[in-house]
């Protein structure tokens, strides 16, 4: 949150170089504040679990957030009751005339399919195109990140030899970057995926900044310089037991999965899994809401031209 102090105070310039939001009396007197509108496109099969995970982190900010959930009409969920979807979710036609300060696009268990073979792909592409002029900052997670990069830049996804599953170290690459304010030089987070993207393609096909990476996970988080596009291939939102549930699910399905790395003590699946990423997750989501959304979006969306260039969209 911003702090209001005398603009002549010597500390002001130091704080500003550290990306701490400082305002003087004149700006504070004219500050327009409204609830921030956040849209969550939930593509995960266990809708209610993902809802809780994301809302837990979004609720950490003192800002008021108005949350809407979006689902793909062209896909019927097999694991969430239709009554839940009809009660708590909206369709794209119901939101397409609205403007949102931020949007989160979750992962989805469809990595094994070419993008174009996903049953809701056409509808998904419509949402992503619409977001250019109706959403200020979009946070893409896991498959949502891969799909976003493919649609916007033609970056492909590639099958890995085996599933990447576990808690992995990553280094922050841009000291002082707003999304990583409060982070140490390195952090850990869960990853759970069968596919990856090429760092070379990111460098050759996009002008995005790579913000974190690790030896096992490769590129982890990248973003546009204006923070309107953010791509995260990990799952900072995951609960302590999420990877465990995925592991036992795959065991029950006869898939013979590897034990998630750096997760169970001594690789003993009867032990309680470690939880060592919650502080990083809290920081990341708070930084996204504060720096990419709250401090950047206009008070009145209607004053923005209905054109991506009005936002400096990259």
Swiss-Prot record:
Pathway: Amino-acid biosynthesis; L-methionine biosynthesis via de novo pathway; O-acetyl-L-homoserine from L-homoserine: step 1/1. Substrate binds at residues 163, 192, 249. One of its GO terms (biological process) is L-methionine biosynthetic process from homoserine via O-succinyl-L-homoserine and cystathionine. It is found in: Cytoplasm. It comes from the Bacteria. Keywords: Acyltransferase, Amino-acid biosynthesis, Cytoplasm, Methionine biosynthesis, Transferase. NCBIfam families: metA. Belongs to the MetA family. Transfers an acetyl group from acetyl-CoA to L-homoserine, forming acetyl-L-homoserine. This is Homoserine O-acetyltransferase. It comes from Streptococcus pneumoniae (strain Taiwan19F-14). The lineage of its organism: Bacteria, Bacillati, Bacillota, Bacilli, Lactobacillales.
